[in-house]
From Swiss-Prot:
It catalyses: (2R)-2-phosphoglycerate = (2R)-3-phosphoglycerate. CDD domains: iPGM (cd16010). The gene is gpmI. Binds 2 manganese ions per subunit. NCBIfam families: pgm_bpd_ind. Monomer. The keyword Nucleus does not apply. This is 2,3-bisphosphoglycerate-independent phosphoglycerate mutase.
Length: 491
């Protein structure tokens, strides 16, 4: 088995048994009908733990393409950190240990919620308890959310933090994320949060009383004014500080204010030394230890093909170009040797339901051209099912599927003539469910399975699997050995 191969990603076209509001089911799709009758196919998981996301969370194009290209599950920061903490690995984490061992006082700061977008309260609690085991005094600097969770939910999360408080662990400050997590260089906001860290803006109220006093002024969690509580005298020289958010964009400014030598946002208290660490890499210019460094993704599908001196072409329209280049290549921006990239402009319309065919025809022409040139691997993304599905327009989504189906017909026909193998799947679903339980338009991705079809010499059946099984399957069609880092193929 060694064939030139097509990897076709039909973005946003998923599997769903029910036909109600299912644009894929209701579309006229002779090519799909032919594939169902003549090609082996299976179902592929695209969400939750199968792609490294939290259990039950819908997949997305970035994660999906990363998983496809890597050929293995790349756990996202939230899941990776949670698994590490569940396995009690923090006690052996060098960045964590080195940071807390430098001072009897450890300051922990981060977003106090279970929203899972920037942080998770379980991480906050786990770090505090591990510091306590090392006989440290722990100062908690709580950032209230109200954006990724309900606007007035802080008291619920506060109770969880108070449950671990004792003589060693105390709540030192509180601030709404509007102030402590600015990302737009509005340093007048950061300055207020910074002042509370320094022991300014004292309130005589308890943390719960203070939150309630803000609610009484119609101030919700996101906008709670920064304050510090009794018995907290501010950060001191030679103390340790860990910011527990795993997402970097809204953590940079406050960490810069605390630790960067070059800072012009506002006048700061001068420290000889603070021992700062961050949960994940926040900025390439930051010198601070990182508890959970970025995972290097090597031996991706594109890299392996390049190592064998074979040619490849990655094709998509604007909306999905980054996904078939940067993301599918494991976060590598520069093309590999013999890797050609074709960018087709997406139509300039306000919303894609106005032109559900998008640029699928132009994408198809580029694919056909590469096939005629004999390119060894062609990776192509059809954006229609996802981008039109996001509009919530059922009729337009049906047309989007029909447009993709027509394009697939041309590609499949030429593939058979030129002896190309083909693997067709989706990175996640969308257009197969266009209304929610209340009959309102549903515009988000679905948390379900997608189809996988294979055309290849000797391939009679394929197993159910997940996106991490795609790369090794493509390499097998090409007659190439998959690296040990990749998971097993589907056949």
């Amino acid at each position: 088995m060694a064939q030139k191969t097509l990897l076709i990603i039909t973005d946003g076209i998923g599997y769903r048994k029910d036909s109600d509001h299912n644009a894929f089911f209701h579309a006229k799709k002779p090519t799909y009908d032919l594939m169902f009758k003549t090609l082996p196919y299976s179902l592929i998981d695209t969400h939750g733990l199968s792609v490294g996301l939290p259990k039950g969370q819908m997949g997305n194009s970035e994660v999906g393409h990363m998983c496809i290209g890597a050929g293995r599950v790349l756990y996202q920061d939230l899941v990776k950190i949670s698994l590490s903490l569940q396995n009690d690995e923090l006690k052996n984490n060098p960045a964590f240990l080195n940071t807390i061992q430098k001072s009897p006082v450890v300051h922990l700061m981060g977003l106090m919620s279970d929203g899972g977008v920037h942080s998770h309260i379980e991480h906050f609690i786990a770090l505090a308890l591990e510091c306590e085991k090392s006989h440290k005094k722990v100062c908690l600097h709580l950032i209230t959310d109200g954006r990724d969770v309900a606007p007035k939910s802080a008291l619920t999360y506060l109770k969880q933090m108070q449950n671990i408080c004792n003589e060693s662990i105390q709540i030192a400050t509180i601030s709404g994320r509007f102030y402590a997590m600015d990302r737009d260089k509005r340093f007048e906001r950061i300055e207020l949060a910074y002042h509370s860290l320094m022991g300014l803006n004292h309130t005589p109220l308890s943390p719960s009383e203070y939150i309630q006093s803000q609610y009484d002024k119609n101030i919700t969690d996101e906008f709670i004014m920064p304050a510090c509580f009794k018995n907290y005298c501010g950060m001191q020289d030679d103390e340790s500080f860990i910011f527990i958010n795993f997402r970097n964009d809204r953590a940079r400014e406050i960490v810069s204010a605390l630790g960067q030598k070059q800072f012009s946002g506002f006048k700061r208290q001068v420290f000889k030394k603070l021992h700062i660490a961050t949960m994940t890499p926040y900025d390439n210019t930051f010198p601070y230890p990182v508890l959970f460094p970025k995972e290097s993704v090597q031996n991706t599908l594109a890299e392996v093909v390049s190592q064998h001196n074979l040619t490849q072409s990655h094709i998509a329209e604007t909306e999905k170009y980054a996904h078939v280049t940067f993301f599918i290549n494991g976060g590598v921006e520069t093309p590999f040797k013999n890797e050609n990239r074709v960018l087709i402009q997406s139509p300039k319309v306000t919303t894609y339901d106005l032109k559900p065919e998008m640029s699928a025809k132009e994408v198809t022409l580029a694919v056909l051209e590469q096939m005629k040139l004999g390119t060894d691997l062609i990776i192509v993304n059809f954006a229609n099912g996802d981008m039109v599905g996001h509009t919530g327009n059922f009729e337009a989504s049906v047309k989007a599927v029909e447009a993709v189906d027509a394009c697939l017909g041309e590609i499949l026909s030429l593939a058979k003539k030129l002896d190309y193998a083909m693997l067709l799947t989706s990175d996640h679903g969308n257009c197969e469910r266009m209304k929610d339980e209340n009959q309102n338009p549903l515009t988000n991705h679905t948390a379900g399975s997608v189809y996988c079809f294979v055309l290849g010499d000797g391939v009679k059946s394929i197993k159910n699997g997940a996106l991490n099984n795609i790369a090794s399957s493509v390499l097998k069609l090409m007659g190439l050995k998959a690296p040990a880092t990749m998971d097993e193929p589907l056949f």
